[in-house]
């Protein structure tokens, strides 16, 4: 399957724990917890089979520590797991461990690291351990937990994307429901601004200090729901084509030109945006399922708010809102105790563990059988982020490094300065496809057209 790089970003599991979870790239905020945190038990007899599990996650460290201790105390195979919680140095430490004899037995993998770890040879396939029941229970996701027909991890939780809106400001403006089209988005932002401007409230904002982050949680998901690849890649033709973004970027520009966008978005980062929203100064923005935890803990909301599906270009859903995730634990290729390591992994993937994981608010399950029985976490606003029939996992697109300005920067420049958007898009298509051709010729990147690709078929796998 063609490759596409999934954005990592904050997710519910980050925010609900009041800390960013990081396997290095894209998820900062962790500090190393010494050299490790061993949870030991006294089960079994004779010499222990000692294995280690390395993770960069801090948000769920206490939960995982409890489960490690439970496994150590209850397993009858004499296996003892040491939990090692790293911080921002996770990737570097893992690289160094594979150059020595200190590599872990089990590795925390994410959508933004599993491909790299696979290519570096850090991971061992787990197919020999998978029963037919496990294969049916845990979805296979090519390029996310499956490579060249072999499984390297199983899913646990995922991240959804939604429109976050200020219900109080909506009521003040007399607006009954969130926008479902781009034109409604523009009109709603204008009405919200008219109702709130006297109090310093504006209809719309995104964290445009980083155009990639801002558009990656807004324009991207609007495009995906409308049937276009969220990063400009067309899976049917195996070429880059940003033309689907034209109405989206024009709508954002119109909101700014109307004066409906919070002043100063050019320098607005995500946390200052959240702080403003919590105070009631923003009517709408788009983001990940991290937001409920943020407004419970980091920036307690002083307003009534909710989340809804993002609008599409014309009100018709022709694709799927990206559901990010698909992996959790990986088996180290250097482990000398792979069977013991798998028994620990199998324990962590038991229904009760995964159900507890969601119900305690660490993440939204991507395992259908768990989603069907797990209770909704007691966190205000989370219900709007739970999987719906329009959430789906997009294939991975090929990573390229175009010369010149990246697409997000080019789009934001147009939003600020105007110009010819069609010409901007034509230039992006030319440069991105040149970079793609170079990557195919020189770097072994694969990009094959799939004329039968149907973005609408991606949804409906996690909820009906």
Segments predicted by a language model, with ranges:
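Mature extracytoplasmic/periplasmic domains
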Residues: 62-63, 123, 290-296, 327-402, ...
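Extracytoplasmic "Venus flytrap"/periplasmic binding protein-like
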Residues: 70, 74-139, 146, 168-180, ...
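Extracytoplasmic/periplasmic substrate-recognition and gating elements
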Residues: 73-74, 149, 173, 258-260, ...
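Hinge/lid segment of periplasmic solute-binding proteins
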Residues: 110-161, 196-197, 202, 215-217, ...
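Extracytoplasmic/periplasmic solute-binding protein
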Residues: 148, 152-156, 161, 186-238, ...
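Glycine-centered hinge/linker elements that transmit conformational signals in sensory
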Residues: 189-190, 235-265, 310-313
């Amino acid at each position: 399957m063609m490759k596409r790089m999934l954005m990592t970003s904050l997710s519910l599991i980050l925010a609900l724990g009041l800390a960013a979870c990081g396997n290095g790239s894209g998820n900062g905020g962790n500090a190393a917890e010494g050299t490790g945190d061993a949870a030991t038990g006294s089960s079994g007899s004779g010499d222990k089979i000692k294995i280690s599990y390395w993770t960069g996650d801090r948000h769920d460290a206490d939960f995982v520590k409890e489960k490690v201790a439970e496994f150590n105390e209850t397993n009858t195979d004499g296996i003892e797991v040491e939990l090692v919680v790293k911080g921002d140095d996770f990737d570097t430490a893992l690289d160094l461990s594979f150059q020595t004899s200190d590599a872990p037995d089990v590795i925390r993998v994410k959508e933004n690291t599993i491909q790299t770890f696979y290519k570096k040879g850090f991971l061992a396939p787990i197919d020999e351990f998978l029963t037919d029941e496990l294969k049916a229970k845990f979805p296979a996701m090519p390029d996310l937990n499956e490579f060249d027909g072999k499984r390297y991890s199983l899913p646990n939780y995922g991240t959804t994307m939604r429109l976050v809106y200020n219900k109080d400001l909506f009521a003040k403006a007399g607006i009954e429901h969130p926008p479902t089209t781009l034109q409604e988005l523009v009109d709603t932002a204008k009405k919200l601004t008219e109702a709130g401007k006297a109090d310093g409230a504006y209809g719309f904002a995104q964290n445009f200090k980083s155009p990639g982050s801002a558009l990656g949680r807004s324009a991207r998901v609007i495009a995906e729901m409308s049937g276009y690849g969220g990063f400009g890649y067309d899976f049917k033709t195996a070429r880059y084509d940003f033309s689907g973004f034209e109405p989206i970027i024009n709508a954002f520009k119109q909101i700014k030109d109307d004066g409906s966008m919070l002043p100063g978005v050019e320098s607005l980062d995500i946390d200052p945006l959240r702080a403003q929203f919590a105070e009631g100064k923003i009517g709408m923005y788009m983001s990940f399922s991290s937001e409920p935890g943020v407004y419970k803990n980091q920036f307690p909301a002083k307003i009534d708010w909710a989340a809804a599906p993002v609008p599409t270009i014309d009100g018709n859903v022709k694709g799927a809102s990206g559901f990010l995730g698909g992996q959790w634990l990986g088996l180290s290729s250097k482990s000398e105790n792979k069977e013991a390591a798998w028994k620990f992994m199998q324990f962590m993937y038991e229904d009760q563990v995964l159900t507890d994981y969601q119900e305690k608010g660490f993440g939204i399950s991507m395992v259908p059988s768990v989603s069907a029985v797990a209770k909704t976490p007691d966190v205000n606003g989370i219900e709007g982020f739970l999987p719906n029939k329009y959430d789906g996992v997009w294939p991975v697109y090929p990573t390229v490094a175009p010369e010149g300005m990246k697409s997000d920067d080019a789009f934001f420049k147009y939003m600020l300065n105007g110009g010819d958007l069609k010409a901007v898009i034509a230039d992006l298509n030319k440069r991105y496809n040149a970079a793609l051709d170079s990557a195919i010729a020189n770097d072994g990147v694969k990009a094959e057209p799939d004329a039968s690709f149907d973005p609408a078929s991606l949804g409906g796998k996690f909820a009906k």
